[in-house]
Amino acid sequence: MDRYSLIHTKMPREFVLLQGTGCRWKKCTFCDYHEDASENPFLVNKAVLQQVTGQYGVLDIINSGSAMELDEETLQLIQEIVQEKQIHTLWFEAHYMYRKKLADFAQRFAPAQVKFRCGVETFDTALRDRWKKGIPSSVTPEDIARYFQGICLLFGTQGESKEHVLKDIEIARKHFEYFSLNAFCNNSTSEKQDASLIAWFTQEVYPQIKDDPRIEILLENTDLGVG
């Protein structure tokens, strides 16, 4: 598994996939990433973080869960790297349930600016509930944007519509400085890919949005070089 990538295109940065202590939510119907966990993830993470050079001053960290689920040794090493490599911007991912802990978490890495992305997946509350995302139906895009600067959107599962995909993109553009569009790839879960929907997106939507600097499009899980 590749866990380090240097991204030169949109939002140039170093991108690392660390191992967490286990996703605390672990209920999303489409996700099996939570299997990437161990009781001593620092053994994996130390080798990954030692590859960070600080080339762009931006470090993006994901861990198949939420940043708050990283072990303490790993968090301390990230703090050291921020200082040693002069990292001025850090990105982390977190579930919405951690929203009120983000500010305190960010203080650990001062003076770096810390930004967070949330795996919202969709703003369609019925679909979000079906996917068991754990974000209440009453939560609005404005609510999410109070805590998170970026989001991840998922598309291409059976039962979605073209209108739903376009609406999600429209909302994300309005409220967030960054978002990724992730095509669903069949995995070990019960969710199944809608190949025709992804083909439509690739042919008709992708050409219109591919140059937007705020949007990263992943047609495969490994398109950013990790996984």
Residue ranges and their predicted role:
Residues 3-7, 27-30, 214, 218-227:
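N-terminal pre-core extensions flanking Radical SAM catalytic domains
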Residues 137-193, 201-224:
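Conserved C-terminal portion of the radical SAM core fold
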Residues 70-79, 99-109, 162-165:
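Distinct, well-ordered alpha-helical segments
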Residues 47-52, 104-107:
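Short amphipathic alpha-helix with an adjacent loop that forms part of the alpha/beta core around
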Residues 33-47, 55-72, 82-100, 113-138, ...:
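Core AdoMet radical
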Residues 196:
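A conserved mid-domain beta-alpha-beta active-site/ligand-binding segment of alpha/beta enzyme cores
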Residues 83-86, 107-111, 145-146, 173-175:
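Short, conserved loop/helix-junction motifs that constitute active-site signature segments
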Residues 2-44:
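Canonical Radical SAM [4Fe-4S] cluster-binding loop centered on the CxxxCxxC motif
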